[in-house]
Amino acid sequence: MALLGRLLPLALALALGPAATPAGPARSPYQLVLQHSRLRGRQHGPNVCAVQKLIGTNKKYFTNCKQWYQRKICGKSTVISYECCPGYEKVPGEKGCPAALPLSNLYETLGVVGATTTQLYTDRTEKLRPEMEGPGSFTIFAPSNEAWSSLPAEVLDSLVSNVNIELLNALRYHMVDRRVLTDELKHGMALTSMYQNSNIQIHHYPNGIVTVNCARLLKADHHATNGVVHLIDKVISTVTNNIQQIIEIEDTFETLRAAVAASGLNTLLEGDGQYTLLAPTNEAFEKIPAETLNRILGDPEALRDLLNNHILKSAMCAEAIVAGLSLETLEGTTLEVGCSGDMLTINGKPIISNKDVLATNGVIHFIDELLIPDSAKTLFELAADSDVSTAIDLFRQAGLSSHLSGNERLTLLAPMNSVFKDGTPPINARTKNLLLNHMIKDQLASKYLYHGQTLDTLGGRKLRVFVYRNSLCIENSCIAAHDKRGRYGTLFTMDRMLTPPMGTVMDVLKGDNRFSMLVAAIQSAGLTETLNREGVYTVFAPTNEAFQALPRGELNKLMGNAKELANILKYHVGDEILVSGGIGALVRLKSLQGDKLEVSSKNNVVSVNKEPVAEVDIMATNGVVHAISSVLQPPANRPQERGDELADSALEIFKQASAFSRATQSSVKLAPVYQRLLERMKH
């Protein structure tokens, strides 16, 4: 596809001549799609265009690149056919469509493009056919035969029963008193029709579809001696009301009418511009819980956000949607507007009950479901659409619901449901305090967080922000989904329960019996002060079992030389904080010893120097501890002086710690993750 994307402009230029070259005049989206259709039909002869027909219908489209490969329009399969491009015709015995259509007047051209019903109705009026056959220059947007036959019987009867007034006026509304080709049909422009100078709304979309009062151009740019004919798929009628006026007169918009008046948006909806209003009906409002609806209606800012979320920044006719589009609302949210067959969808749901109600300043689609933006929601409501239901139940059980439904400015750090696959912690005072430390005292946005920032929690703790290349973490927990910003609170979906730091690295090691031998070694090497003071350390902490696994001779040699012991221990300490969520395929972390540690993560297993880490992310106020089951060796350990004066005392302390470890090993069992987390909070 990438190669095709580079070659396609060149191929188009070769196929179509100088007008298609990059140096030539700019082409409209319609012309670009037509060029692509011509390129696809070239193998069938000159001036042949590929056309996609929607199976089971008579709807045809010139094909763009995406549709050509997908063979779908609005999710429905299409078949490819080949026909003469506009302005050309077949010649018996010749390949393709080599002959240009002979030019005739507008009336005759109506027959050429297949608009025979429009031609017939033109005949019935006294004045119009002479104009179409006489001098001048006109554009006619001619309804197809199917367009006339699909009119309601009462509408058609009213037209044909008064041909020299009603029918004549209707046909004149389809005409402009000059020649207008598709290149001149600009998105959002208005053309002055030949009926009382009433405006015709033009929209020219990036996908090449052109609409006239939301009727799609089927065959465009058919030249005549006195103008041009564009075939369209609907009979269009005059538009006199703006969006606000339509809201005022439609009974189904009673609630919407009151909401617009309360928000002050009526000025926008009756002014100039081109908008799409996804207008919720009374039934749409009734589907919302009364408590939620009353809260929003009583909050001017939330109400304005709610209504703005139903207004698109430009007019979007239904016929312009042939695949999913991401469209931004005035509120700032992006809606996925798509189609499935004849149904329009919003965010994948077929909630549009009436489409293409035209206004002078846009178009209205009726919807039967309210589109509440995140900016109008409470934290509870934000969570309902996120993968955090288990965490929300914990907050509710712990009596913290008021924080999630009120007007308190805060940020909720909610672990995703998979975090609790092995169960949830018991609800008690310590769990409640832990949950309070998942609430930040301000409404934040992740895009404004920076490395080293500290955040105050409702539980009284300070949490640190760590920014890594591919992740953004708060203590040991990293943000797993885009944050959702509500009316007062912001929801961060986190990848694990957060562990607030409870002491220095030395405090953490001393409080865990698994590290008693390491603590003894640190004390003997004179590193206690280093790991107690302020700093940013990552400690790969060998457990007692790791030391006991060393050959006895090697262990004695190590403990007999304090400088070498310090050198090896420093190799276990990185000079920055690296939590597991910040580890990518490979991170090289500089140690206090000077050499670098190679830290990696694969299939949720963290390794250091290819040795698996037994437990990650034991948080400390000056760093993080990762438990490992082996003692790491520097890549090149230079000879050190023995430091004999410390050797005996160091070895004795180490032996005592080792003995203590063996004595307690059989009775001390690893607690479940939540129990260990809660135990740490005691200190």
Curated annotation (Swiss-Prot):
One of its GO terms (molecular function) is cell adhesion molecule binding. PANTHER family: PERIOSTIN-RELATED (PTHR10900), TRANSFORMING GROWTH FACTOR-BETA-INDUCED PROTEIN IG-H3 (PTHR10900:SF82). It comes from the Eukaryota. InterPro entries: Adhesion/Biosynth-related (IPR050904), EMI_domain (IPR011489), FAS1_dom_sf (IPR036378), FAS1_domain (IPR000782), TGFBI/POSTN (IPR016666). GO terms for cellular component: extracellular matrix; extracellular space. PROSITE patterns: EMI (PS51041), FAS1 (PS50213). The gene is TGFBI. Residues 1-23 form the signal peptide. This is Transforming growth factor-beta-induced protein ig-h3. GO terms for biological process: cell adhesion; extracellular matrix organization. Gamma-carboxylation is controversial. Gamma-carboxyglutamated; gamma-carboxyglutamate residues are formed by vitamin K dependent carboxylation; this may be required for calcium binding. According to a more recent report, does not contain vitamin K-dependent gamma-carboxyglutamate residues. Keywords: Cell adhesion, Disulfide bond, Extracellular matrix, Gamma-carboxyglutamic acid, Phosphoprotein, Repeat, Secreted, Signal. SMART domains: FAS1 (SM00554). Binds to type I, II, and IV collagens. Its main location: secreted. The keyword Phosphoprotein applies. Disulfide bonds join C49-C85, C74-C339, C84-C97, C214-C317, C473-C478. Pfam families: Fasciclin. Residues 45-99 form the EMI domain. The keyword Repeat applies.
